A protein has these predicted regions:
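Well-ordered beta-sheet/strand-loop patches within structured domains
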Residues: 2-213
Length: 213
């Protein structure tokens, strides 16, 4: 480079080659689907198109995510900011204990489903916050509220094997499953199941700025 700049002559140089391997290959993928260590299902009104759409987007962002030993998983960092530009729609959310409408309504049902699946799998909960009022899709105290500029849901993998998140939605239900290798010695926890009974829809105030879905 120096000769080229000072003398106008071309020069050649050899760059060392270093192999870069993916963290996840087909062999690891097969291994991690051997044992289900956690799962949870919640239910929602599929006739609420906007909320269902938001749930679908969040579920797709979570599906097939890996968390390696000692790693922490952040719900907010995985999904990113929920904006209209990313396809999220206005739907009912909880704001300071009241029902309102905002972009990304329904996302907290996904984070709450993930929390219960993760807790059942015996993973370490690092950060979790509850809504300011009970939500209908999980038992009291079993929710995990999230907001881009506010609460996050974070967990850590304390095991000596990676874990795989599988997430699905459709037909009015959201299911999240946690898988790992057959050799994993996990410590599962008892977690109460969600009710299949759906609440009645309620009117919402659209003039709200700070939202927590």
């Amino acid at each position: 480079f120096y000769r080229y700049m000072t003398e106008g002559k071309s020069a050649s140089m050899e760059a060392p080659l270093r192999a870069v391997y993916p963290r996840v290959d087909s062999e690891l993928l097969t291994t991690l689907k051997e044992k289900r260590i956690g799962y949870y299902t919640t239910y929602y009104n599929s006739n609420n198109r906007n909320r269902s759409h938001n749930i679908d987007l969040a579920v797709k962002a979570l599906n097939n995510r890996y968390v390696f030993p000692g790693e922490s998983f952040s719900f907010n960092q995985t999904l990113g900011e929920r904006t209209a530009g990313k396809g999220y729609r206005r739907a009912k959310v909880i704001v300071r204990g009241e029902v309102a409408e905002g972009i990304g309504g329904g996302i907290c049902q996904v984070s709450s489903t993930l929390f219960n699946a993760v807790d059942r799998a015996g993973l370490t909960i690092v950060q979790r916050y509850s809504h300011s009022r009970n939500v209908p899709y999980v038992p009291p105290g079993r929710d995990a509220t999230v907001s881009w500029y506010g609460p996050d849901f974070v967990f850590n993998n304390p095991y000596d094997h990676p874990v795989l998140i599988r997430a699905f939605s459709g037909g009015g239900q959201t299911t999240i499953l946690i898988y790992s290798a057959e050799e994993i010695h996990n410590r599962p926890r008892e977690v109460p199941s969600a009710s299949k009974k759906l609440p009645a829809e309620v009117p919402a105030d659209r003039n709200v700025n700070q939202i927590v879905p």
